[in-house]
Amino acid sequence: MKFIKIKNTIVNVAEIKLIYTHDQLLYIECTDIVHRFDFGTEIGAMEELNRIYKQLE
C-alpha cells in the first residue's frame, strides 16, 4: 500500500481511507479518484492533486 502524507484536510473523497495520527497529520490511501480537496482554494487543490499523482507514478 502506498500512503501519502498531507498536512491539510481532505473532504468529499471517493474510496480513500483516511488515517489521522497523534500529531494530526493526515495519511491517505489512494484507491480511487479524489473528487475535491479543501485546501482553501481550488487552485491549491489542483496543485496538491498534481503533486500527489506525480508521487504515485
Which ranges hold each PLM region?
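Acidic, Ser/Thr- and proline-rich intrinsically disordered linker/docking segments
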Residues: 2-7, 15-57
